[in-house]
Amino acid sequence: SRVYSIERYKTLADMAKKRLERLNISNVTILLQDGFFGYAPQAPFDRIILTAAVEEIPSFIISQLKVGGIMIVPVGLPNQKQSLLKVIKNEKGLDITELMSVRFVQMKEGLEKV
């Protein structure tokens, strides 16, 4: 299986690539790009993990999840209590379970200069 990780900070992408190389992990691709809309070229995915909060579950990311796939996503407004949700896509829609309260940075569009 293959893992794709999208990073909007060049320094973090470079660090991740070096660490994976040092650990001899070869099934992970680190992409330096805007991940706001997911990664449609390799969709659909078995699993999706968002590591930044969204105000609501993005339909364009759900569309990249296979039926039977699982997404972990922090949902909520900035600087407020957010919920970490487990979303399972099934034939009829979504099965959503709240896992815990969390606080994540808000998801942003674009690349950072650093």
For the regions a language model picked out, list residue spans one by one:
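Core SAM-dependent methyltransferase catalytic element
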Residues: 83-114
